[in-house]
């Protein structure tokens, strides 16, 4: 008879005079019970009034049940937070599931750009949230070291090393000159004059498939790979797997995957090319996997890579999650067809998340240039401008389905308009309260939490109680921005509480009217209770920031 969770709502009323919690259960059950919602609401309210810890139950409107807890029950969340500590908010409802989360996966042809930086922040935060929900998460970076992008990169390096113009389809930026110089020096240190190696011009006049281009590729790709890895580590993103696309070809996995599809009747030949009959599985058109010139199309590696994720010896995944940029909408149909072709369920065994654009703003104007990378803003540009904490938080706090503006001036400011400062300052402020309380000799042990009975106390308690549900919802929806929004809500009520309710008594003035003022100088029992509440807020902010990969500072 109880409705499912998608339709049953238990929420905090916007108007706190309506109580601590409100539910629509009477409206959901009324038809099955053969009663009017308001009538059923009264029946349920009578039963709820007999429950220990509930101070008041009212039925409002068409059947909403509003519940007010007594102060001791409302404050029970404080003990729950402090007992659980860093694990408060975590749950195990995704335990037993292995999720492969692939994100960033930028081509190894240059520094991570701002779009990839957003995926680094969102992806790692999402992984942390999913782990807090009990899942085993494999963070994976797919290193595209096979195909035309690498050829363009190598041609660009050869041209730079010889002081020649950038090829028509080449890469530019000072990083190309840097890497070209490093390659030449590394080769020279090993006794090789790489610039004297044979060259071949292609039909466009650029460097063709020459021994020199191959030598540059062999040395430069690992350099770029190491640079990307370091950028990720500096951004507090630690991948479990760095997967090389080339390995799919070298190990024969691409050929075996195609053979498996051929045995199912899903491969055919046309116009000298080999095709995947993906329309059988909902794609809008069939896909070429081996081109007429014998070279593999990108989708060939996609097929083998999905199978690898599902069948690998270590941590095969129940669900492969791909985080892709806004220009990859066309990928969805073919990828879901690959999933279905191997007997898996799209949306269950595979999920594709498409992110939107990032705009970097400085002095009210869009920033489009990097000193090192030319016409793109890189991860290092952003971190140099605002730091890792502000960069991660600002990129993770907006739903990845929406474009986001990163205002460098705002993120560098120490004002309440800066969301990461606002949240981190709440944590630092709570730590300062701790230090002042210790200096004042306040004993928090055995605190009577029923003394947390003011409106400001109740507001903080109510928001604290929301955190476990926020974590679960963020995990179910793969939406780490919900954690950031919650932290800003908690920081807001905490700052208001701090300004209204003293924890540490003020210095005595000798004036009875001031020194006996409960607001100015709370009695030891009330001070101890407030200190425990302060501790609970501190813990939850630290937990939430941890899910976003952001530090919780002791001082600011």
Question: Locations of the language-model features?
Answer:
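Non-catalytic interaction-recognition regions
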Residues: 1-75, 82, 86, 93-556
